[in-house]
Each structure stands twice: as structure tokens, then as C-alpha cells.
């Protein structure tokens, strides 16, 4: 069952659509459930709402398997996604991959604070949640902001799963943050990356993969249950992301 509603984002002075998946048995008991927060909400649950027409199809996947988890999808702002999902302004590593210096980014801190201070309290108040069993998952820039959220709030986001993360946008800063963060409360981290993220652009493929490997190495030092997979032939598109969606739940539920 999927519910949708707008919620006000104080820092951004705007409303944002929220999509909440409730497991099949939710309305037939008083059981409490763990919660998974995901970004790019339009692309999480079904193709009908997906911006590019292809989603992760999680509503169908979760219903078919009867998984007992509440999933909260936060809609993306199509005009400001890069700014909201990047905690810092894009740096030199980003320029190296893209080929030009960009000044996007820098609103990620406020976006994560919205999740922690406004959205999560609302979800915990209005749904039967296990408040201290909270995970986060994201794709591309959603992966970057998920790892940032974990570093800033490791006591909240103890389980993280990210696909094809665009760490390169804030490579220098996210490396520094990981090194400085106490992640002793974090339980599990799953990362992956395709080896053809940019199709036939081999230089970008190489740098993108290297970016993810560096982050994996840093996280593995701090969180023993950190896993990284290189997906052969996988490109940066939802056709490939959808195939890996089950990994979110198989890893987080171990």
C-alpha cells in the first residue's frame, strides 16, 4: 500500500511530496516496522510515476515478497537536485570527470537536516515505526547524500545501501568527512558501481569506479561490515539500477 502527502521543508520554504510504502499486514495489527528512507522518490515505487519512465519498482517487489519494512521516498526537486544532494559545492575531482568547473551543490546539509528534524519525527509520530531501526538508500547523487547523512547522524542511519554513487561531485570533502567521523554505531554499508557507468567513455568509467573504490576503502576501515561490488557491464541508468534493487533488502536484512 502506497500513501502520498506533501510536507513542508522549512529551510527551503517549499512543500515536498513524500511517498510511504506500508507492508501488506500494516492495517491488520499493531506491529512496528523498521524504516528505509530513499531519495528520488518518484523513481522508487512504480514506472507510472518515474521521471524517465523506469523505476526501481519497489512497490511490486515488496508486495510480492511480503517484506516487513516501511519505505519512505522523498521526491526529488528536478530543478535543484544537484544542489540538494551535494553537501558542498562541486570541487576539482568533479571538474576532472566532467571536464569543466561547476558551482552547483551546497544545500545537502539543509536537505539532510529536513529528513532528521522534520520528516523522520513526522513519520515516527504518524506510523508504527521502530524508531531506532532506520536505514537509508540512494542512487548516484542519492548515494553521496546517504553516506553524508550516515556520517553526520550515525546514531540514526546505521544501515546504508548505495548504488553507483556520484561521490566525485564532492570527492575531496566526503573523503575528509569519513576520515573525521566516528562510525562505531554504523552496522552495515553496501556500495556498488558499474564498470560502464558512462557507456563507452572509458576515462569517465575509470575515474567513476576509482572514486567509489576510494570511498569503500575508507568506510571499510571504520565499518567492518562494508561490502563493495563492481557490476560488470552496468551503466548509469534505471534499467540497470532496477536489477540491483533487491540488494538493498538482502544486505540490510542480514
Feature locations, PLM:
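Non-catalytic cap/lid and distal C-terminal segments of serine-dependent acyl enzymes
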Residues: 1-254
Amino acid at each position: 500500500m502506497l500513501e502520498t502527502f506533501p510536507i513542508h521543508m522549512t529551510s527551503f520554504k517549499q512543500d515536498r511530496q513524500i511517498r510511504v510504502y506500508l507492508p501488506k499486514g500494516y492495517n491488520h495489527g499493531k506491529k512496528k516496522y523498521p524504516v528505509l528512507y530513499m531519495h528520488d522518490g518518484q523513481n522508487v515505487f512504480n514506472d507510472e510515476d518515474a521521471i524517465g519512465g523506469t523505476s526501481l519498482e519497489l512497490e511490486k517487489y515488496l508486495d510480492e515478497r511480503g517484506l516487513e519494512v516501511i519505505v519512505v521516498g522523498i521526491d526529488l526537486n528536478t530543478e535543484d537536485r544537484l544542489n540538494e544532494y551535494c553537501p558542498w559545492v562541486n570541487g576539482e575531482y568533479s571538474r576532472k570527470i566532467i571536464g569543466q568547473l561547476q558551482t552547483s551543490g551546497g544545500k545537502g546539509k539543509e536537505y539532510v537536516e529536513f529528513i532528521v528534524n522534520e520528516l523522520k519525527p513526522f513519520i515516527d509520530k504518524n506510523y508504527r515505526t521502530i524508531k531506532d531501526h532506520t536505514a537509508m538508500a540512494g542512487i548516484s547523487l542519492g548515494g553521496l547524500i546517504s553516506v553524508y547523512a550516515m556520517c553526520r547522524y550515525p546514531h540514526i542511519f546505521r544501515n546504508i545501501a548505495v548504488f553507483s554513487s556520484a561521490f566525485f561531485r564532492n570527492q575531496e570533502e566526503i573523503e575528509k568527512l569519513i576520515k573525521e567521523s566516528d562510525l562505531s554505531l554504523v552496522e552495515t554499508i553496501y556500495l556498488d558501481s558499474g564498470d560502464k557507468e558512462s557507456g563507452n567513455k572509458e576515462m569517465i568509467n575509470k575515474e567513476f569506479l576509482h572514486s567509489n573504490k576510494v570511498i569503500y576503502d575508507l568506510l571499510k576501515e571504520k565499518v567492518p561490515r562494508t561490502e563493495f561490488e563492481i557490476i560488470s557491464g552496468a551503466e548509469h541508468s534505471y534499467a540497470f539500477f532496477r536489477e540491483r534493487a533487491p540488494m538493498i533488502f538482502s544486505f540490510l536484512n542480514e
